[in-house]
Amino acid sequence: MSTDNKQSLPAITLAAIGVVYGDIGTSPLYTLRECLSGQFGFGVERDAVFGFLSLIFWLLIFVVSIKYLTFVMRADNAGEGGILTLMSLAGRNTSARTTSMLVIMGLIGGSFFYGEVVITPAISVMSAIEGLEIVAPQLDTWIVPLSIIVLTLLFMIQKHGTAMVGKLFAPIMLTWFLILAGLGLRSIIANPEVLHALNPMWAMHFFLEYKTVSFIALGAVVLSITGVEALYADMGHFGKFPIRLAWFTVVLPSLTLNYFGQGALLLKNPEAIKNPFFLLAPDWALIPLLIIAALATVIASQAVISGVFSLTRQAVRLGYLSPMRIIHTSEMESGQIYIPFVNWMLYVAVVIVIVSFEHSSNLAAAYGIAVTGTMVLTSILSTTVARQNWHWNKYFVALILIAFLCVDIPLFTANLDKLLSGGWLPLSLGTVMFIVMTTWKSERFRLLRRMHEHGNSLEAMIASLEKSPPVRVPGTAVYMSRAINVIPFALMHNLKHNKVLHERVILLTLRTEDAPYVHNVRRVQIEQLSPTFWRVVASYGWRETPNVEEVFHRCGLEGLSCRMMETSFFMSHESLILGKRPWYLRLRGKLYLLLQRNALRAPDQFEIPPNRVIELGTQVEI
């Protein structure tokens, strides 16, 4: 969905509630339970309850309301957000060395997202299904199987798209937030003393009283803000104002009421700590609450899965991941895509996590490191944008960065305590993704440099061919070229081995711009290089999928008529061998060869009819 669509503000705001706030909106299922479960050495004590509630509330205010909604969301690329977008913006007006550091930060942030996304569906759905323990304790052995069944169904429907089901997301999530508010308000009315925790002094008192333990406990408090990156990442779908409006009018009040309602319940009945969320409800409402909670967690999981698809497409288009099959599940909305490989790899990982950890409390120990690590990187990148792109006063920007890091770094450091108890999981997955992305980017650059380091001038070659033309055959030949001024390998090999050339030759370059979309007016640039040679450069944004048939259609409108089924497409296929390298670079080279063998072939990437493609092989040492 885009704000360009002529929809009313209430409709867009409602849709944002259904998609953007799924993850953070299901955090009340487990956050306060993990804070006060006894793992930090104190039980359900009044000072601890007040301290945690104060910390949660002020984290929601500072991190979500101030940092992300007010500051970070100012940094957009044609309305789009996300950690890779922020990386791109931050590196626009900096030196090459600084840009390299910012790129590494952005890739680490993107990798952290991959690490955390395996945990989100598992902990969300398991937390909802665990409500069965309250309804029927004898069914506790069914929590893991039921969680797997629910998520299996969710991953299976991905290939059909979520357009139809997505229409239900908004009303379900709005109902969910109203239930959160209603349950919390009911409990607060019975024990209004809990509202004293709105005073930030209770958070300070908590640190003074519990000292070191209170710092470690921040690792549980951070569960209340998981999913905060979705606010920024989904900005392009809904716009800044609807996302902000949804937060301040519905989401923040509902979360606050529910957390404080759970606190009021615990002050009256400390034994409710086993599941304070579900015990807020009267007995007659437990089963309906269990059902709506399961639906809300499925929606939260769906938002995360869609986020992975979007991030993967962006990484592929920007050259950080190998090409893979991307299926559009909606003719109306370009953002609705399905990536089979990512879908099923994620599914397998989620199932393994559920079977291994068995309970959401165990998963909570793995949650937080990647989230807080991304928060630190977002602070650095966004303030870099403020200084370099917006030209804010450097001292003011420094104060903002210090303020952000004073919150982010303690949260990240506190979560490092979870490293051995589960935090290794997202870090390991994130590390793997970082290695994969940097390997593909660097080795691809090395390959292209190796292929073109001995290349001749394109203009000189065309002039030579026009002066002493080889045998010409009827028809049009299109040579795919990765760079504008470089002779395509396929063209050189065709001349070398076949010694013929078509009557009309088009050198086609498909380029990804640093923007989500490219206007149709700027889509295709045509340049006639000689009487028989043309250069066509087609530009796409990183949220768009290149399509050669569309390019030809636009060429026809510009006077260069081409028919797909009467054109031969020449492409080079590199057979790679590893040269002499140090052992660590040799390992990276082997990983690249593995990625290259499994990458989507160019004809499939650009939707070129297979019977019109001629691939010419060449051996390249890297």
UniProtKB/Swiss-Prot annotation:
The name this protein goes by in its record: Low affinity potassium transport system protein Kup
Keywords in alphabetical order: Cell inner membrane, Cell membrane, Ion transport, Membrane, Potassium, Potassium transport, Symport, Transmembrane, Transmembrane helix, Transport
Function: Responsible for the low-affinity transport of potassium into the cell. Likely operates as a K(+):H(+) symporter.
Catalytic activity: K(+)(in) + H(+)(in) = K(+)(out) + H(+)(out)
Localization annotation: Cell inner membrane
Chain's gene name: kup
The species this protein was found in: Shigella sonnei (strain Ss046)
Chief subcellular location: membrane
TM spans (from-to): 9-29, 49-69, 103-123, 137-157, 165-185, 213-233, 247-267, 276-296, 337-357, 363-383, 396-416, 419-439
UniProt-listed InterPro entries: K+_transporter (IPR003855), K_trans_C (IPR053952), K_trans_N (IPR053951), Kup (IPR023051)
GO molecular function, one term: potassium ion transmembrane transporter activity
Top-level taxon of the source organism: Bacteria
Recorded family membership: Belongs to the HAK/KUP transporter (TC 2.A.72) family.
HAMAP family: Kup
GO CC annotation: plasma membrane
UniProt-listed PANTHER family: LOW AFFINITY POTASSIUM TRANSPORT SYSTEM PROTEIN KUP, OSMOTIC STRESS POTASSIUM TRANSPORTER
Membrane topology field: Multi-pass membrane protein
A UniProt-annotated Pfam family: K_trans_C
